């Protein structure tokens, strides 16, 4: 199984395992809408690739970490598309979650994806609890404060911001978390992989900014 298929299989299993016939059906549908079809799955691919480079001796934990990273990324997109931020009508070639399901359900969808991400790590912790504990901290730093995705989004609410600080928080932090998480899932030191994630995240953001300027929005699917 190639890496993308492995990630999508893990994501499908995670959503299916946490859906219930007596749960809110529109929320269940919105969660799937937010995650599928996926984009390039760059961040979870980095996580799995680093884990494989480090031996990948706990694939269940690797899959949980990669899935959690993608769910956190999807949550950030759902929230970023909201009318109070970008008010984006399209995401990944289909209506954004708030365009398809309404603003209130979009907020709840993003929240639910964040909770599910950390729930997956907790459920996979049995085989290697110390590694899982480290992963929870790594991913929390990648999405939280003071330098994660939430901080990156918060910089948009400030009158002035250093562009590099903004890029590092909004984009780079989760790339760094992905490479470090891959190493941690495999029981390897994460420090050697931190710079790789930092550099890839910054390069990705610059490329994405250029693409936004020179490309047709319809071609971008966002």
Describe the predicted segments one by one.
Residues 1-19:
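N-terminal amphipathic/basic leader segments beginning at the initiator methionine
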Residues 23-222:
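Mg2+-dependent prenyl diphosphate-binding active-site environment of isoprenoid biosynthetic enzymes
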């Amino acid at each position: 199984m190639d890496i993308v298929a492995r990630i999508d299989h893990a994501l499908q299993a995670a959503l299916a395992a946490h859906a219930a016939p007596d749960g809110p059906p529109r929320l269940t549908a919105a969660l799937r809408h937010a995650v599928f079809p996926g984009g390039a799955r760059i961040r979870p691919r980095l996580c799995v690739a680093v884990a494989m480079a480090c031996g990948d001796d706990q694939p269940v934990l690797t899959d949980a970490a990669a899935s959690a990273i993608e769910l956190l990324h999807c949550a950030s997109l759902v929230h970023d598309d909201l009318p109070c931020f970008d008010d984006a009508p399209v995401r990944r070639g289909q209506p954004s979650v708030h365009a398809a399901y309404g603003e209130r359900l979009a907020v709840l969808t993003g929240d639910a994806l964040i909770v599910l991400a950390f729930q997956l790590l907790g459920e996979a912790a049995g085989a290697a609890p110390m590694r899982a504990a480290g992963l929870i901290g790594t991913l929390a730093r990648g999405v939280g404060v003071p330098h994660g995705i939430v901080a990156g989004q918060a910089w948009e609410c400030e009158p002035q911001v250093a562009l590099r600080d903004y890029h590092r928080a909004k984009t780079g932090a989760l790339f760094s978390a992905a490479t470090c998480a891959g190493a941690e899932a495999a029981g390897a030191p994460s420090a050697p992989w931190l710079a790789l994630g930092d550099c890839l995240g910054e390069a990705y953001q610059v490329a994405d900014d250029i693409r936004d300027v020179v490309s047709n929005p319809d071609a971008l699917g966002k």
